[in-house]
């Protein structure tokens, strides 16, 4: 039912329990939404059966874009709501949840960049680190989500020209 259904009363009704039962687990709508967001990100970026996607940066990016493309119809409005909704929240908890969720993706990208045997030895420096490049790649990924454009070919070419 979309994001409108992610509230204490709707979840209680869907589960056939009292509102108080839901409040035993979630103290506020923000906590409930945060748990839903984390669960959805975990579903979209669940660990792939084929570990080869983490062997090189190009394979990882292709996999990430495929997963985002999968996630859009599975969870309509999720990406734009999460990308924009938590940023606009005044609550520190919502912003912290967003940072934690995204940090997991950034950490995975950094790990792939560091272990990718195809990366030129001089590709990264003190002024241009794997963390910075992962941040750039992640920004491009968020842009793709907002635009609903899941063709990674331009991003793949940027990777080839920048670090290979």
Tell where the protein language model's regions lie, with residue ranges.
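Amphipathic alpha-helical interface segments
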Residues: 1, 25, 43, 67, ...
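Helix-turn-helix
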Residues: 1-31, 35
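Short helix-capping/turn signature of helix-turn-helix
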Residues: 3, 26, 82-90, 143
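Short, charged helix-capping/linker segments at alpha-helix termini
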Residues: 4-5, 120-128
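Hydrophobic alpha-helical connector segments
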Residues: 35, 49-74, 130-134, 156
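Short, basic, alpha-helical segments at the C-terminal edge of helix-turn-helix-like DNA-binding modules
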Residues: 38-45
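Helix-loop "lid/cap" segments that line or gate small-molecule binding pockets
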Residues: 50, 65-73, 81-89, 112-113, ...
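Amphipathic alpha-helical packing segments from all-alpha helical-bundle domains
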Residues: 73-77, 81, 90-119, 128-131, ...
């Amino acid at each position: 039912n979309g994001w409108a259904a992610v509230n204490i009363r709707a979840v209680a009704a869907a589960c056939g329990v009292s509102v108080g039962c839901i409040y035993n687990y979630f103290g506020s709508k923000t906590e409930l939404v945060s748990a839903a967001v984390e669960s959805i990100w975990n579903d979209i970026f669940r660990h792939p059966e084929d570990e080869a996607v983490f062997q090189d940066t190009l394979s990882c990016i292709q996999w990430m874009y495929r997963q985002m493309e999968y996630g859009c119809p599975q969870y309509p409005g999720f990406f734009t709501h999460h990308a924009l909704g938590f940023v606009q929240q005044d609550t520190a908890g919502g912003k912290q949840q967003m940072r934690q969720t995204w940090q997991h993706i950034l950490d995975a990208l950094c790990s792939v960049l560091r272990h990718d045997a195809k990366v030129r030895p001089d590709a990264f420096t003190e002024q241009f680190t794997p963390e910075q490049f992962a941040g750039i790649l992640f920004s491009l990924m968020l842009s793709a989500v907002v635009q609903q454009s899941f063709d990674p070919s331009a991003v793949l070419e940027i990777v080839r020209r920048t670090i290979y």
